[in-house]
């Protein structure tokens, strides 16, 4: 059933609000995907904080008009699903991971930081760890020396308590 003009304006406003907050948009062709698979994709996207939507391309073009993603309008042809995310890699990661397991989803293009990305660039973006993963790695690197030092102090304390108390009180040279 076609949308009336008010519904179209509402859709454009909703998508424009998402685009205004977004860092990345990824576009993929979805011909022939089963409803169950598409439902799984939407659930995964929701968990990752990705706004996933099937839109008429004309409405999508209007939503990105005047934004850093306007260059993506040329790629908006055919049956497309749009992944929009505030996290720079989340939408690329969700759609790329799904495309690996479902050959009917074909990545077409993306846009990040005002630049239009081709398929290989979207895949490269998807391979970058997310912000949360990077923070976890950084904390792990920062925590390792502290943990090692704490274990060393614990081992020294245990050795001192086992050793003769006279050695501990010996004058330093």
UniProtKB/Swiss-Prot annotation:
One of its GO terms (cellular component) is ribonucleoprotein complex. CDD domains: Ribosomal_L10 (cd05797). It comes from the Bacteria. Keywords: Ribonucleoprotein, Ribosomal protein, RNA-binding, rRNA-binding. GO terms for biological process: translation. Pfam families: Ribosomal_L10. GO terms for molecular function: large ribosomal subunit rRNA binding. Part of the ribosomal stalk of the 50S ribosomal subunit. The N-terminus interacts with L11 and the large rRNA to form the base of the stalk. The C-terminus forms an elongated spine to which L12 dimers bind in a sequential fashion forming a multimeric L10(L12)X complex. This is Large ribosomal subunit protein uL10. It comes from Cupriavidus pinatubonensis (strain JMP 134 / LMG 1197). The lineage of its organism: Bacteria, Pseudomonadati, Pseudomonadota, Betaproteobacteria, Burkholderiales.
